[in-house]
Amino acid sequence: MNITVTYEHSDDVLGPFELSEDMSLIDLFALIDFKEESQIIFHNMKQLDTKNTNITLKEAGLQNHDMLLIKPKNPASSQAAFGQPQEIDLTDEQYIEQFRTFLLENPSMAQEMGLPNLEHMINNKTQFHQLLGPVLLSRRGERSNNPFGIPNSEYSRLMSNPDDPVNQARISELTNQHEIDEQLRYAMEYTPESFTQVSMLYIKLEINGHPVKAFVDSGAQQTIMSTKLAERTGLTSLIDKRFSGIAQGVGTGKILGRIHTTQIKIHDVFLPCSFTVLDTPMEMLLGLDMLRRHQASIDLKNNVLRISDVETPFLPESEIPKDSLHALTTPAADEVRKAALKRDSSSGKNAMTGDANKVKQPKIPSSTTNQTVPSFAESDIKKLVDLGFSRKEAINALNKTGGNVDYAASLLFQ
């Protein structure tokens, strides 16, 4: 038969134990460490007779899948052993004496405490109260029997004058923290996966016949290639250094320039792609510009990336480059993801306002600067300024594109 044992004072559950119905009660008590002098055992809501322990489980009325409940004989003293005595209506002297009485009744617990001369102090009431009393009272004050889990002294002070502004602020703080703790317990019980690390999205592709594991990041504006990958794939000669500058995020990184177009191979499909070449440990990042251009679809249900009618699976965690995982936690990763391009004073300004801009951008009439500047949202202007352009350039671009930030950014990068 299968028997399960539960303890009332700790909610611990033992079993189920697979036992023979011919097993004696005394053997069962030894198995579950039942102490008759301090505990009571119940079966089917009735106290089990422990006077005759030589009878079998079958003779005692136990059946398959039954549960036994073990309760302490003296709830107050038992809970005191676990640091949670019944201290309601107990004075400090009564509380200390209750603890001493429990240790007298449970010498094994006294031995586990490991205090020198404890046995002598237990038998000397005055010495026990003088030496251990302050320690027990300190623990009693730190323990809480209130919904906020704070010391009872603080809880009593707050509840004695709840209309006081200071107390109200503290109660509000405790209430909010209690709700947060409840949410945490709920999340850990029902959505434990939210506390685990999620694998990033990588796919396999080829550039000039070289296999590459590319990080797919729809949160990055631009597609990035590292300088080492550009060298390995023989694309260094195609870097337009007029687009060099500084990538600024948490830290800074050097932008060597831009590769305007090259082909990448995903399965049997060749796709044109442009890259910003950045000095970063991450080899390659597929940003939103390339994903939008080829109308890519990130299918998390099937764990694939659909692009140009081709499905390519995302790599399992075991195949993700370890150095790239480290790169995602460094400041350089933030530079790559945000792609907040800021030109330095020496080369960046020439890169963005050089010959390429003179050819592709129409010249702004000089009278424009004297006209009243249309009012655009400060957040839109800031987005363009964060890309490395001056406030004046940002406003002019917004003026030309009717306030569309995306079009304005494209215009400025031409």
Swiss-Prot record:
One Gene Ontology term from the biological process aspect of the record: protein transport
Domain Ubiquitin-like: start-end pairs: 1-77
E.C. number(s) listed in UniProt: 3.4.23.-
GO cellular component: cytoplasm
GO molecular function: aspartic-type endopeptidase activity
PROSITE patterns registered for this protein in UniProt: UBA
Sorted UniProt keywords: Aspartyl protease, Cytoplasm, Hydrolase, Protease, Protein transport, Transport
Protein name: DNA damage-inducible protein 1
Source organism of this protein record: Kluyveromyces lactis (strain ATCC 8585 / CBS 2359 / DSM 70799 / NBRC 1267 / NRRL Y-1140 / WM37)
